[in-house]
């Protein structure tokens, strides 16, 4: 790390607004299709092969993930389409995604998934979404239809077959459609070696940067629905832990939903509540949510999950423009000057004494990363490696090969060392030995 000025994060200055707007339009407008993310660094050398560890591996270029959504559904149940309209009902099902063309073999996909270089992009396509059940999110939690019970039984059967006994819940950001959410979840599942059960939550994003305000509104309306989903997963699945990966504006759903969940059970014994909900890793990747609101929510629910991770890129161009829209900084690119002395002290204590890890994601410490990157959690091989290690091993930053850095005022951050590929490889070997 360099000096303290590195972490004095500010909202993008007006003179840079034009550049940010152009960049965000490019982010929003390019590549409507999802292409297979770069191979995580740990999988590029051949030393670590998560696919080889999977006793139930199906050697196919098709991937199936579960989903929950409060988007309105149309069309036949075995080929459901989901539109932008908000729905108070939770719709549950499975989505089948194909990696590459229909002619791609497992041998092709395996080679592409364990190599650093690729000759061309590999597109992911949603072949079908099969809706299996729907339920009223406002109904009592004990009132479950036979179809909904079958859905949760299917999740439990998948967990029984899976090497990883945690359920990973992915929540997408703004400017997204159902297809993109399914493809992101599918490729994350794929790079776990298909060893993890992944469920994605598709909230009704308007699928357009120009309708960002609609996304903000729909994210807010989704909060109680998502909170109820967490209760349902705790009640009806046998997952060891329920882990959450919230990307960008997905934090506008997840952060207040966790706070609401804690408030709704404020009178209950915290030990019993933790055992009931079994929340594990909560990972906020480039969170697009008001910085102070994020901290207020965090203070409410921090005693619920095993751990909370906040990733920070001070140069994130997408969050810079979002900050101008909201007139306050975003949690993934925060301005500490917005905090009172008391709030600053709480952040210091949380980073040192509470289950909160703040990861410093910047081009100054991570080579070949775009300085304004918003998608780093899956687009950069170092960061995606760290995400996989964290979710697969429930490992803390030091165990994963990251290095601590302490600000002058006491806030503790974690960053990627120059020899991270070597450190992470050694970390994987240690963790595999310890977790046997």
Model-derived features: positions:
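C-terminal motif of bacterial Sec signal peptides marking the signal peptidase cleavage site
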Residues: 26-29
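Sec-dependent N-terminal signal peptides
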Residues: 18-24
């Amino acid at each position: 790390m360099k000096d303290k000025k590195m972490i004095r994060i500010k909202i993008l200055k007006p003179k840079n607004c034009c550049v940010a707007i152009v960049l965000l339009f490019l982010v929003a407008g390019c590549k409507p299709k999802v292409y297979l993310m770069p191979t995580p660094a740990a999988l590029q050398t051949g030393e670590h092969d998560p696919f080889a560890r999977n006793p139930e591996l199906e050697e196919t270029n098709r991937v199936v993930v579960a989903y929950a959504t409060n988007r309105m559904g149309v069309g036949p149940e075995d080929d459901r389409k989901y539109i932008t309209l908000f729905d108070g009902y939770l719709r549950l099902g499975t989505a089948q995604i194909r990696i590459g063309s229909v002619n791609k073999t497992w041998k092709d996909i395996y080679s592409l998934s364990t190599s650093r270089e690729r000759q061309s992009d590999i597109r992911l396509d949603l072949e079908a979404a099969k809706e299996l059940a729907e339920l009223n999110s406002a109904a009592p939690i004990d009132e479950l239809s036979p179809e909904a019970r079958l859905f949760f039984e299917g999740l439990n059967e998948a967990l029984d077959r899976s090497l990883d006994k945690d359920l990973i819940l992915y929540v997408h950001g703004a400017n997204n459609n159902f297809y993109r959410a399914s493809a992101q979840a599918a490729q994350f599942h794929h790079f776990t070696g298909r060893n993890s059960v992944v469920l994605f939550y598709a909230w009704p994003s308007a699928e357009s940067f120009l309708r960002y305000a609609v996304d903000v509104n729909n994210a807010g309306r989704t909060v109680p629905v998502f909170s109820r989903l967490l209760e349902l997963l705790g009640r009806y699945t046998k997952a060891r832990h329920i882990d959450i990966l919230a990307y960008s504006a997905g934090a506008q759903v997840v952060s207040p939903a966790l706070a609401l969940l804690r408030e709704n059970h404020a009178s209950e014994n915290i030990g019993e509540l933790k055992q009931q909900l079994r929340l594990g890793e909560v990972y906020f990747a480039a969170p697009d949510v008001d910085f102070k609101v994020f901290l207020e929510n965090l203070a409410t629910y921090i005693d619920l999950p095993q751990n909370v991770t906040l990733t920070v890129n001070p140069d994130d161009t997408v969050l810079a423009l979002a900050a101008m829209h909201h007139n306050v900084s975003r949690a993934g690119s925060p301005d500490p000057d917005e905090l009172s002395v008391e709030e600053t002290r709480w952040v210091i204590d949380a980073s040192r004494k509470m289950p909160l890890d703040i990861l410093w994601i910047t081009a100054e410490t991570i080579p070949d990363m775009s300085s304004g990157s918003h998608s780093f959690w899956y687009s950069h091989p170092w960061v995606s490696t760290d995400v996989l290690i964290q979710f697969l091993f429930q490992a803390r930053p030091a165990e994963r090969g990251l290095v601590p850095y302490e600000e002058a005022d006491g806030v503790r951050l974690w960053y990627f060392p120059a020899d991270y590929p070597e450190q992470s490889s050694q970390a994987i070997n240690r963790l595999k030995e310890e977790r046997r």
